[in-house]
Regions:
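Core catalytic alpha/beta fold that binds nucleotide/phospho-ligands
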Residues: 1-125
Length: 125
């Protein structure tokens, strides 16, 4: 059964501007070291950052809490299976809340163009 569903669109130019303006403090607040390393390995890194940003926003919506109760951006980490399929790992307060809700399966889909990134997250029991 679906416990939560979240969808988000991130504007690539907006994410690029935030990274260029705020630099490392912004990156460290929003992205995990693994996510930063992954995005930086691509020529189109800002599209990758925007995709992960959208995934984190969509995850927060699926969780149903907003950015309150101690939930942080880095509590949501986008990882990849060997096949390249994106998966979502939860830590910290996000993991505690998901466990309390009975979340046992998380589905994540991310797509992007040069200007936008979209992510959808489904939490299931």
């Amino acid at each position: 059964m679906i416990i939560g569903l979240g969808v988000d669109i991130a504007e690539v130019p907006r994410i690029k501007a935030a990274i260029e303006r705020r630099g490392q403090p912004f990156l460290r607040r929003v992205y995990t070291p693994n996510e930063i390393a992954y995005c930086e390995s691509f020529k189109n890194k800002f599209e990758r950052y925007a995709g992960r940003f959208a995934a984190k926003e969509a995850s927060m919506k699926a969780l149903g809490t907003g950015w309150r109760g101690g939930v942080r951006w880095v509590d949501f980490e986008v990882q990849r299976e060997q096949s390249g399929r994106p998966i979502l790992a939860l830590t910290g307060e996000a993991a505690k809340i998901a466990a309390a809700l009975g979340v046992r399966r998380i589905s994540l889909s991310i797509t992007h163009t040069e200007s936008q990134a979209l992510a959808q997250v489904i939490f299931e029991d």
